Amino acid sequence: MQKYLLFCLAFCVLGCLAQDLIVRPNDPIIYKKEGGAFLWLGDTAWELFHVLDKEEIVHYLDNRQEKGFTVIQAVILSELDGLDKPNAYGYLPLVDKDPTQITEGYFELMDFVIREAGKR
């Protein structure tokens, strides 16, 4: 469980780094590198990586951008049957439920989502 938590935390940190955000000690405001405050207006799409295909993901991200959301919150492993039920492309996240053996196809979709989100 600790490995999952650490992996999820690392994923969140990488997402923040991709945004070029600045966090200052003792300051509750997150800043954009180019200046100004960053408003964390998040939508929860917990099973985004697990349920949607690429076309649906692009549609979802476009819709969230139109509505002004700045953050999409999702989980890497679905809470309900996330290790046993494949994603939209038939990939399970782990080989034999072993957290040291990831399935590349499953995580390639996450790379796609991050790239697409970065375009918006």
What are these language model-derived features?
Residues 4-14:
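Sec-dependent N-terminal signal peptides
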Residues 16-18:
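Boundary at the C-terminal end of the N-terminal hydrophobic targeting segment
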Residues 20-120:
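Active-site-adjacent substrate/metal-binding segments within catalytic domains
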